[in-house]
Amino acid sequence: MSNNTYNLPTLSNEGGLAAYLAQIKKFPMLDAEEEYMLAKNWQTTGNVKSAEKLVTSHLRLVAKIAMGYKGYGLPLNEMISEGNVGLMQAVKKFEPEKGFRLATYAMWWIKASIQEYILRSWSLVKIGTTTAQKKLFFNLKKLKNQIAPRAEGDLRDEHVKDIANKLDVSEQEVVSMNRRLSGKEQS
């Protein structure tokens, strides 16, 4: 790489999250036309500077999405780092001629990277790996808060049925995952 590349911000334990967030705010947001031109340039010529500008202009999006996963008890800096990997994948595969903005496309790659990190980080004993179990893992807390915001511990039968129906999983899977996530699982 040449010397005229961006000085990309790093997220370290020493600098802290606040310093990183201050750094990424310095990168300008792109308007639709500039984003399109940079993406086409990256796609057709492989111009790394164009790709870097696309990445740096979307680092705030990664941080915002990662903060939505704070409830899983994992280090935020690691979730942001994983989200950044997803952002880079999105830039690599982005097709600007389809008419969507990069943020719309990248959001799915960022979320997928963060969710995969969370799944890798949680013990396989704690969670499952089937599609239904992943759906349950990532949606149970949100649905519980919607249905019974003040409920602690085990769910009432009607809440279990409601969640099972909404997520298309068995009632036993809901009860089991709820116990796993609340730390009440019995071996």
Question: What spans do the regions from the language model cover?
Answer:
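Alpha-helical promoter-recognition and RNA polymerase-docking modules of transcription initiation factors
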Residues: S2-I127, T131, K135-P149, D162
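Short linear Ser/Thr-Pro motifs
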Residues: A103, Q186-S187
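Long, charge-dense, solvent-exposed interaction surfaces that engage phosphate-rich ligands
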Residues: Q146-Q186
